[in-house]
């Protein structure tokens, strides 16, 4: 009886192995974190913001994924110089952008470890001003979105990602355009690790 149980268990394992091997396909979606660089071109001089963000995507088919991402850029104290001929005054700014975008990613090379892609996303960008800590500033930025302080944004971009098994790195470069009395173009670059599942 014991021999038959062992043989039945071994037979079951042999039947299950092909389906387990097939289940190791990493083409269902991705989740990742990234460092965010945002060049705010509306002011003179331009302001370079750096922050962090997260992204999740689900594949509709091997070449198309739907993604959502959010990034928060930490305060950047920059200085504007005003001169009235006699004195010069330096004014710090504690602006903190919050980006939230959603849209498709069209990828080429879905079966290879390196993929190129283009993306087109829509969403919002919110500029909050706070001298609080990063955690409290993030809460303030989220509250600003619900208060109507967010601006409509579009993001056309392109990038490349490479994977070794389920773990990889991704680089995006694009133009985050928000609308405030006209279109405002801003360079945006993200880079970070991703996990396929």
List the predicted regions and their residue ranges.
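Gram-negative (and chloroplast) outer-membrane scaffold detector with strong preference
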Residues: 32, 37, 57-137, 152, ...
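Surface-exposed extracellular loop regions of Gram-negative outer-membrane beta-barrel proteins
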Residues: 157-171
